[in-house]
Amino acid sequence: MSALKFVRSVWESFRTTSGVEPRLIDAMRITAAEPGKVNFELPIEKQHTNRLGILHGATLATMVDTSGSLALASRGLYSTGVSTDLNVTYLNAGGKIGDLIKGEVICDKFGKTLAYTSVKFMNSKDEIVARGSHTKFVALAWKDERNITEDLKPAVNESQASEATRTSFGGNKHVVGE
């Protein structure tokens, strides 16, 4: 199974069984996935905004949490563990109703006990809106029979790639050593 298909199946599980995701970010779409990286987008609607009419920080925090889980799914974990740490840094306004917020999340480290992810968000003007990090306890998630971790190994080892070489916003892909 491809990373994209597997990530979308895990996302569908979130949407049908969780309490938060279907209420707040149900319209989020997974646009691309490969082992260790997921791209997604969310059309901004009223429930995503604050009283100023712009994207609410809680929406972005929810997306940091959920996208971190999806980054782990891109490595083959169906049950994606539980959060131990989550951080969001807000840099620019995310947009208003009708705008599109785009995100890219990367699995920085995929261990047997803990996994680490980082995400960045871009607004409709291609400005960076926020960046986040998410740490998850995954020791029990490795036991799920639905995992396909052997099928979804990244082409580049995490320790060989830097943030700059693994991101693809704007469609540019960089290879280590270029």
Description of each model-found segment:
Residues 1-178:
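Terminal targeting signals and extreme-terminal segments of soluble enzymes
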